[in-house]
Structure formats: C-alpha cells, structure tokens
Amino acid sequence: MATLPAAETWIDGGGGVGADAVNLTASLAAGAATGAVETGWLQLLDQAGNLSSSPSALGLPVASPAPSQPWANLTNQFVQPSWRIALWSLAYGVVVAVAVLGNLIVIWIILAHKRMRTVTNYFLVNLAFSDASMAAFNTLVNFIYALHSEWYFGANYCRFQNFFPITAVFASIYSMTAIAVDRYMAIIDPLKPRLSATATKIVIGSIWILAFLLAFPQCLYSKTKVMPGRTLCFVQWPEGPKQHFTYHIIVIILVYCFPLLIMGITYTIVGITLWGGEIPGDTCDKYHEQLKAKRKVVKMMIIVVMTFAICWLPYHIYFILTAIYQQLNRWKYIQQVYLASFWLAMSSTMYNPIIYCCLNKRFRAGFKRAFRWCPFIKVSSYDELELKTTRFHPNRQSSMYTVTRMESMTVVFDPNDADTTRSSRKKRATPRDPSFNGCSRRNSKSASATSSFISSPYTSVDEYS
C-alpha cells in the first residue's frame, strides 16, 4: 500500500518551472490500500518533456518537468502548513494507538479465558490480528509516505508495504464473512454439527492462503527507484496503468462487494428468523435467554460489518472517480480528500474493540480486567465470574427425563382384557411430544417446528452471548 499522495510542486533551482508546475496529489497513488505508483512514475522520472501529462499508476495525469531543467535542480517541496500536518499526524496516531492496543486486548480476552474460546470468537481473534497488523505495519508508514512523497524504509519493506495491506483486509473481511455463515448455520439449522476448533483453524488458514495469493502480484512487481534527493516505492505493472486499474477493480470486488453481499444475505435471513420467529405462548426462561443472546451477537456483528462497509466506501469511491475523471487530480484540495478517505478506511481497524466492549458484557468485563490498574475502573465480582463461569442447558432429550411419570406417559387399558383378572392390565405408553422441553406452551405441537432454531443439544449460552 505504498502511496505517493502528497501535494507537492516540482520547482527548479532558479524558479523557472515552479510557476507552471502542477501539484502532485493524493490520487497519484490512491491505491494506498492496494499499491502505489508504477509505470507513469518511470515515464515521469526517466524522460524529459514539456509540462505535460503522463499516466500514473491509476491512469492519472502527473506533471513532467521541462526538458531544460536537469533532475539535479529539481526539489520536492511540501506545501502543507505545519498545523495541518500536526492535525493529520494526531488523527493517524490515535487510530494506530487505539487499534493496536484495543485489538491486542481482544486477542488476550479470548485466548486467556476458556469460556471465550468459541467458534465465533476464534474468527474474532483472526479479525483482531488482521486489524492490529494493518494499523501497526501500514497506517503510519503509508501516512508518512503520503505526506513527504519519499520512501525511507528500504526495498524489502516496500514489497511488504504493497503486499501486506491487501492480505490483512482480505483476512478481516472474510473473517466477518465466516462469522456470518457460522451464525446462519447455527440459527437456521442448529442440529447440524458446529465447526470444531480444528476445522475453524483450517478455515482461518485457508483465508490467509487466499489472501496471500490475491496480494502476491503487488509483492512481485514492487520496486524502489532512487532519484536525486529522494527514493520512491511503487508497483511497476508489466502492462502499465490499465493492468493496475483492472487489478484494483478485482480487489474491490473480492474484498468489498462480494463478501458484503454474502453477509447482507445471511444476516437478513438470520434477522428475519430471530426477530420474526418467536414462538407464541412460550414462557421458558431457557428459550428466551438463548433468543436474547443470539440477537445480541447478531446485532453486534451487523454493526461491525456496517462499520467496515461505511469506512471503506469513500476510499473505493475516491479511487474510481479519480481514475475516471482525471481532472480531479489537479484540484487543490485533492490531497486533503485522499488523507481523509484513507484515514476513514484505516480507522475501521480501531472500532471493533469499542463495539465489543459496548455491546458484549463478557468483552466489557475483559476490558475492565485489562484496565483494572486505572483508578476509575472498578472490577466487580460479577465481572470476574463473567469470564470464568460456563452455563450449560440440557437438551430437549435430556429434559424429558426430568418431568414426572404422569407428564411423560399416558396409561391406556385394553378392553379385551376386561374379563380377566382386574389386576392384569396391559399398559401402553404413548410417547410424549418430542418438542416438549420443559417450557409451558399453549400448543407445543404447532410450536415444535418453529423452535428448532432456538435449541440444540447441550448448547452453551456462551456460544451466543
């Protein structure tokens, strides 16, 4: 995700070109999340020409200096005022600090407490790791490159910078997709076996392998070029800017549109089932507790997905618009638009821990324990128990043995035996309604079909809350 989005002016030592130079803007590498400058930069840097447009990484116009000006006399002057740099630095610094710390705490809460080790939470660990890595290894480095248009971090990190962000975003969004599919299966067809810990790890490993394959071209074609006075990091595509544009569109489809479509469908079906399928007349505490817990988890994950979609949408729109309408790249505020859209995209890495803390009592208890050293944070005994106690409910089959004999069978006398000794009677036990689970219902038979999504054998409430 190396970029070159800084507003800068090519100025020759004597000032002849400066008056006619064009600001190089954020859009020169709007692929901050997917790659940076390539063929166009080589054209810009290796050939002399009048102040004219050459295609950049995304097919955007960049300014070439006049032929009379030697490269040695060209300087890269950053034109943003210091107060604006300070504000952007503070904004990006907050994202990095909150994202790294918050996601590391989420990982600790899940892995350090046995009660939290559920299928959904294993995917949340993968999501937290992806977000923390993105914030730690990409956000600040990319921001520095965007501000100064100079690569300070070497050729190897240039490859990593162009390669890893796509990998991390892919892992994040498909971890959310895996959670959506798992919630769908658990609620719509609860009698099917759930993913085991081993199967969950295989799914997570497969997500990362696919992410590496998608991002590999960015690593393969990454290059650095040392120019007089500065170094650039870019992706040089063999077939030029059009190939990069095609690749970026493919990335948008695979890491944004397609997974959001899948999650939209699954959560819509799950939402209709949970909020529209309550059984009339059911007063069982177990039923209502599981229903409430499932609703909370689904609501939390819907908010997580919507946050991701909203944060990344302006960035993708920015790239598409600046690629199609190239004159936008000469707008004097385009760098600020880029920095704002990139900040919003990167800020998606810091919201999830906040959402978990606000909407899930066990994560909230975990965050309290993590910050118990703060004088204004009080950890109650209830918070301690939240991360230690596991509550299991019996399944429908086991609950039938807890009711009385009178409730579980009906004795029927055979009239053909009336002439025999009165003490000799044949008893036939009529099986009880298998939908009965100890809850009082007005019509258990009519409710049995609807209740299948609520209870599965030996289900822990921890799976849903």
Swiss-Prot record:
Keywords: Cell membrane, Disease variant, Disulfide bond, G-protein coupled receptor, Glycoprotein, Hypogonadotropic hypogonadism, Lipoprotein, Membrane, Palmitate, Receptor, Transducer, Transmembrane, Transmembrane helix. It is found in: Cell membrane. The anchoring of this receptor to the plasma membrane is probably mediated by the palmitoylation of a cysteine residue. Pfam families: 7tm_1 (PF00001). Residues 108-117, 182-201, 271-299, 360-465 are cytoplasmic. It is a multi-pass membrane protein. InterPro entries: GPCR_Rhodpsn, GPCR_Rhodpsn_7TM, Neurokn_rcpt, NK3_rcpt. GO terms for biological process: positive regulation of blood pressure; positive regulation of flagellated sperm motility; positive regulation of heart rate; positive regulation of uterine smooth muscle contraction; regulation of dopamine metabolic process; regulation of feeding behavior; response to cocaine; response to estradiol. This is Neuromedin-K receptor.
